[in-house]
Amino acid sequence: MLSNISAGENSEVEKIVVKCSKSGMHNYIFITIPIIYSTIFVVGVFGNSLVVIVIYSYMKMKTMASVFLMNLALSDLCFVITLPLWAVYTAMHYHWPFGDLLCKIASTAITLNLYTTVFLLTCLSIDRYSAIVHPMKSRIRRTVMVARLTCVGIWLVAFLASLPSVIYRQIFIFPDTNQTVCALVYHSGHIYFMVGMSLVKNIVGFFIPFVIILTSYTLIGKTLKEVYRAQRARNDDIFKMIVAVVLLFFFCWIPHQVFTFLDVLIQMDVIQNCKMYDIVDTGMPITICIAYFNSCLNPFLYGFFGKKFRKHFLQLIKYIPPKMRTHASVNTKSSTVSQRLSDTKCASNKIALWIFDIEEHCK
């Protein structure tokens, strides 16, 4: 069994057995997955590069949300630039021609992106919750410095979680076929450590963040529903936006997390069936595509839905240089949020989109 010989997934070479050596080796995988990887690469580089340029050149990272979104775009960029390597790797029937160093770098970039993306999306949901539900109480804490320190902590924790890829990920050459794979190669004595890391990926990398994101946006929806109780159409818009955020996160990541857990069961010999091996090895690259398609959608959802971001984006494509003006800090804006939420003028300016607006003002 070639257990999860694909981008960013666990592979215990010592447990490869001859009777399952063809699991996951299907021609449609070698054709379809590289095409999808290439598509994600093009769209991801384009979308995330625009986010970086707009925030850095026009918005100057003056709010917590803009700092989080900038780091989210940079994290996604670090990942998507490795996709051509994985596309070639898959197209060559899981043969890695790029050497040991790129194997480690590309694999680490994937794990790093997984944790930074999830943690940053969680921080964005908490920031939106604080700004909308507790604008006055959160004013002191919601500063750019706090956001930057939070991002430093996120990158540090994500790197520590990626250390198994740095240490164990390497090329391995099968002597009978001369096939070179990029895999996690470790002794059988380390299996429980690797299983533990996979479970951490399930719990810390998905379940806990999902609960926080779901709770944050549920409370946001409840607050805005009370504010706009008399405006049914507005409530529907807000509700749809919040549901889109939660469902996008859930459906992009849950398939990959389920297959990661199945892989844990395989590593622990709980599952010892070649048919199930084939299902996991075949499905894993597909779930990877679904999960990391999120890297394409993030900038559009969290950036282009914002009114001010769209304005600066249009300036960029029209080659209009950024205006030399001081952007109002979120600290000077938050004191009037409570009044704005009840103001009819702000209601007419699509407050539903304010959930995603990283400059946080309604004019």
Curated annotation (Swiss-Prot):
Subcellular location: Cell membrane
GO MF annotation: an example: angiotensin receptor activity
Transmembrane domains' residue ranges: 28-57, 64-91, 101-127, 144-167, 193-218, 240-268, 279-304
Keywords from the named record: Cell membrane, Disulfide bond, G-protein coupled receptor, Glycoprotein, Lipoprotein, Membrane, Palmitate, Phosphoprotein, Receptor, Transducer, Transmembrane, Transmembrane helix
Annotated GO CC locations: external side of plasma membrane; plasma membrane
Tissue specificity comment: Heart membranes, follicular oocytes.
InterPro entries: ATII_AT1_rcpt (IPR000190), ATII_rcpt (IPR000248), CCR1-9-like (IPR050119), GPCR_Rhodpsn (IPR000276), GPCR_Rhodpsn_7TM (IPR017452)
Cysteine pairings via disulfide bonds: 20-274, 103-182
Keyword match Transmembrane: yes
Protein's UniProt keywords contain Kinase: no
GO biological process, one term: calcium-mediated signaling
SUPFAM superfamilies given in the database record: Family A G protein-coupled receptor-like
Coarse class of the protein's main subcellular location: membrane
Sugar-modified residues: 4, 178
Pfam families: 7tm_1 (PF00001)
Topology in the lipid bilayer: Multi-pass membrane protein
Highest taxon listed in the record's lineage: Eukaryota
Lipid attachment in record (S-palmitoyl cysteine): 346, 362
Extracellular side: 1-27, 92-100, 168-192, 269-278
Cytoplasmic side: 58-63, 128-143, 219-239, 305-363
Residue numbers binding angiotensin II: 169, 186, 201
Post-translation changes: C-terminal Ser or Thr residues may be phosphorylated.
Function of the molecule: Receptor for angiotensin II, a vasoconstricting peptide, which acts as a key regulator of blood pressure and sodium retention by the kidney. The activated receptor in turn couples to G-alpha proteins G(q) (GNAQ, GNA11, GNA14 or GNA15) and thus activates phospholipase C and increases the cytosolic Ca(2+) concentrations, which in turn triggers cellular responses such as stimulation of protein kinase C.
Sequence similarity: Belongs to the G-protein coupled receptor 1 family.
Designated name of the protein: Type-1 angiotensin II receptor B
Naturally occurring in which organism (per UniProt): Xenopus laevis (African clawed frog)
Gene: agtr1-b
